[in-house]
């Protein structure tokens, strides 16, 4: 049986990046990220939790320690558990992302590892 939970609220991770929880089950959860231009979150990663992001509106640069991916509308990226990443709105307007994640791997709960300070300012050119 799948139990639907509806904790619709804003996350407090970064007050300029709005996270809206859509729904959560025992296996997966879904959310929307909304932020204005030239906003980025901190480099971080999740243990026991894969993420998929799809750009609904705007442009998102996904930075990892080894590569950058510039995503346009309807582009999608998979970030595996334990892979550090940073989401950056490098477009000229609002960015809307649809996020999906699993609720843990091999029975282990998902966790967010404390933020890893970014050394790349959002104003640097993005190499695609």
Positions of PLM-derived features:
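Conserved short histidine dyad/triad with adjacent acidic residue
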Residues: 31-46
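Ligand-binding loop in jelly-roll beta-barrel domains
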Residues: 81-108
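Structural motif
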Residues: 59-61, 68, 84, 94
């Amino acid at each position: 049986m799948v139990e639907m939970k509806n904790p619709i609220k804003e996350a407090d991770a970064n007050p300029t990046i709005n996270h809206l929880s859509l729904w959560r089950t025992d296996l997966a959860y879904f959310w929307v990220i909304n932020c204005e231009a030239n906003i980025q979150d901190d480099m971080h990663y999740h243990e026991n939790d894969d993420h998929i992001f799809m750009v609904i509106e705007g442009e998102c640069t996904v930075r990892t320690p080894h590569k950058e991916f510039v995503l346009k509308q309807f582009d999608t990226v998979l970030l595996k558990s334990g892979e550090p990443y940073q989401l950056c709105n490098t477009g000229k307007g609002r960015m809307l992302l649809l996020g999906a994640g699993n609720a843990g791997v091999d029975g282990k709960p998902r966790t967010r590892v404390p933020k890893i300070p970014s050394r790349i300012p959002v104003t640097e050119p993005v190499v695609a």
